[in-house]
């Protein structure tokens, strides 16, 4: 019988790599929380029509990449390929617009697209997203970008570049679309196959083709900026001014278009020069028409999503990641000691300490080796002799220093031991398995 393994394009995330994921998520949660952003959790699968209407039937995501199926009720369902459409559906369904003000929402979770697996791109991948719904103010665009850069900086990531563009409103894009088609049509035979297919369905996507021959043709194409309305120009200028005031560097990239049809006005990507072909770690922009397009009230909005796999890849390249908070590794040997060790572990955890209890029942030597590999700051050693005296041996794993103390001393003077543990704690890189 063939062995059962994870499907191509999916992967298991195991310790210690999970520590990296938790650190990314915790960092984002803290930063966004300070900006009054609240979490929303939406279903992993939705009606297929949600993505067809929201993302756009002419997009590659809808046309080629979605995992769609029919359930036993003969309903067409799809595993979510991105997070914004589901968040907007929830915003409409639960009447969040009627609460007034700006809804500041975030999400984290798995997404699904049928793509060729490669480093930083899986068929099941994870995104962290931010959505600010209910404001057309340029400050929202700047704040969204500022929060994204703050998260990436807090993770210690370097060699990042912010690319910025405006894709205008629907009227701007319609005029530009025709001009682009008129320009590209004489070159149709010279375009790569994907771009030839997009020429009729979604010509703006040709602008970010990776084919060198197509890029050379596109380099001389009309500029979208020449087709922006006065209002679109003013909004884009305001966003640029605000980013400058915030001290956020950016590069204007007139060929930048996002792969989803709902974007309007501001579009941006944060690019890492330390990644290969999959260099975008965060992408987003404004989507003023999506809420009404999905049946809700006219609602301007802006948001972004980060690819967690790509952040992990960057952190794998040498960035130090805080280890899991494990204070003590508790080893025991003997009938009395083993029972008492369980009680001591629970009491220490209740006092706020991180404790791993060795449950192997093996000799002390083997337990000590596991303690050395555990990442704990100190090892607590309990034999029957110590248990009968209500004592425990403490060994600081980094220095090798040892001492014997009463168990009650650990519990009653917890602040002292917490400060000792903190002083001994060091930040060390966590091994991350290749993606």
Swiss-Prot record:
GO CC term (a single one): cytoplasm
Pfam families on file: HGTP_anticodon, tRNA-synt_His
Catalytic activity reported: tRNA(His) + L-histidine + ATP = L-histidyl-tRNA(His) + AMP + diphosphate + H(+)
Main subcellular location: cytoplasm
InterPro entries membership: aa-tRNA-synth_II, aa-tRNA-synth_II/BPL/LPL, Anticodon-bd, Anticodon-bd_dom_sf, His-tRNA-ligase, HisRS-like_core, HisRS/HisZ, HisRS_anticodon
Gene3D superfamilies: Anticodon-binding domain (3.40.50.800), Bira Bifunctional Protein, Domain 2 (3.30.930.10)
PANTHER family: HISTIDINE--TRNA LIGASE, MITOCHONDRIAL-RELATED (PTHR43707:SF1), HISTIDYL-TRNA SYNTHETASE (PTHR43707)
Family of this protein: Belongs to the class-II aminoacyl-tRNA synthetase family.
Protein name in the entry: Histidine--tRNA ligase
């Amino acid at each position: 019988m063939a062995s059962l393994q994870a499907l191509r394009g999916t992967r298991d995330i195991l310790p210690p790599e999970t520590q990296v994921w938790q650190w990314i998520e915790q960092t984002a949660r803290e930063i966004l929380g300070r900006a009054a952003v609240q979490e929303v959790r939406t279903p992993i699968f939705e009606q297929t029509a949600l993505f067809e209407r929201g993302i756009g039937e002419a997009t590659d995501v809808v046309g080629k990449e979605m995992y769609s199926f029919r359930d036993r009720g003969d309903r067409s369902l799809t595993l979510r390929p991105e997070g914004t459409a589901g968040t907007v559906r929830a915003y409409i369904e639960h009447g969040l617009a009627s609460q007034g003000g700006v809804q500041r929402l975030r999400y984290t979770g798995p997404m699904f697209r049928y793509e060729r697996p490669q480093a930083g791109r899986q068929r099941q991948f994870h995104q962290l997203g931010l959505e600010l719904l209910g404001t057309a103010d340029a400050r929202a665009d700047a704040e969204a970008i500022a929060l994204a850069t703050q998260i990436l900086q807090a993770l210690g990531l370097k060699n990042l570049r912010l690319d910025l563009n405006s894709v205008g409103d629907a009227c701007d894009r319609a005029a530009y679309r025709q001009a682009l088609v008129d320009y590209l049509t004489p070159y149709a035979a010279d375009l790569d196959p994907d771009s030839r297919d997009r020429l009729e369905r979604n010509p703006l996507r040709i602008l970010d083709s990776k084919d060198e021959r197509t890029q050379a043709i596109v380099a001389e194409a009309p500029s979208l900026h020449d087709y922006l309305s006065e209002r679109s120009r003013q909004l884009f200028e305001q966003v640029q001014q605000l980013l400058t005031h915030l001290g956020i560097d950016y590069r204007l990239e007139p060929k930048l278009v996002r792969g989803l049809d709902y974007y309007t006005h501001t579009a941006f990507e944060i690019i890492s020069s330390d990644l290969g072909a999959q260099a975008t770690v965060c992408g987003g922009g404004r989507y003023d028409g999506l809420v009404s397009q999905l049946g809700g009230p006219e609602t301007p909005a802006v948001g972004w999503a980060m690819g967690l796999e790509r952040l992990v890849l960057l952190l794998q390249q040498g960035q130090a990641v805080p280890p899991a908070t494990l204070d003590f590794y508790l080893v025991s040997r003997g009938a009395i000691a083993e029972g008492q060790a369980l009680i001591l572990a629970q009491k220490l955890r209740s006092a706020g300490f991180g404790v791993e209890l060795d449950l192997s029942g093996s000799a002390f030597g083997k337990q000590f080796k596991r303690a050395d590999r555990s990442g704990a700051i100190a090892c607590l050693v309990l034999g029957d002799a110590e248990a009968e005296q209500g004592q425990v041996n403490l060994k600081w794993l980094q220095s090798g220093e040892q001492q014997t103390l009463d168990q009650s001393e650990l519990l009653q003077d917890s602040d002292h031991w917490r400060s000792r543990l903190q002083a001994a704690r060091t930040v060390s890189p966590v091994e991350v398995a290749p993606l």
